[in-house]
Structure formats: C-alpha cells, structure tokens
C-alpha cells in the first residue's frame, strides 16, 4: 500500500528576481531555464524545467546550452496568419544562456 503525499507549492527564484512556482507532491532540487536578452534590452526567463537531483539539473543545463547555442543571434519572428509566413521583427536574441537555480526552502 502506498501513502500519498499531499501536494505543496514549491518556488524557485530566478537571478533576475522572477519567481517560478509549481504545485507538486514530488521533491525537486533545481529549476533550470533559459534566459534571453534581446537587442532592445528586454530580459526574459523561459519556462523552467524542474529537476529532482543535481545530476539531472546538470543534464537539463547541458540540453539548455545546446538550445541556447542555436538561438544566439537569431531574429525574433512572428507568424503572419493572413499571409501564412514568418515576419522578422528587427529584434535579435543577443544573449541566450541556460541557468539552474536551487528550489527555495
């Protein structure tokens, strides 16, 4: 017989102060996310991937770094539904990096 653990709210704070939250009964140690810095000065934190062990957090960081390398320097495009094409916005991803932060106690 298994005992169920009551779901609780966990949080992790990004380096820019944004707080990620999740409601779960599982145990997580880190939140890994991509941080985008755009040519217009905007900084955006992507949706986090939660890891339950430090080695899994490192695995998420490695995958994030691979994604970041492909996105670095690319232009942000929007989908034009009427003409069915992507249109460049003139805004570029100047810096993309993978970040892991510990879950708040």
Which sequence ranges carry the predicted segments?
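A short, exposed loop/beta-hairpin motif centered on an aromatic-Gly-Thr core
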Residues: 39-63
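Positively charged, low-complexity intrinsically disordered regions
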Residues: 9, 23-27, 31, 54, ...
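Short, mixed-charge low-complexity intrinsically disordered segments
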Residues: 2-18, 63-105
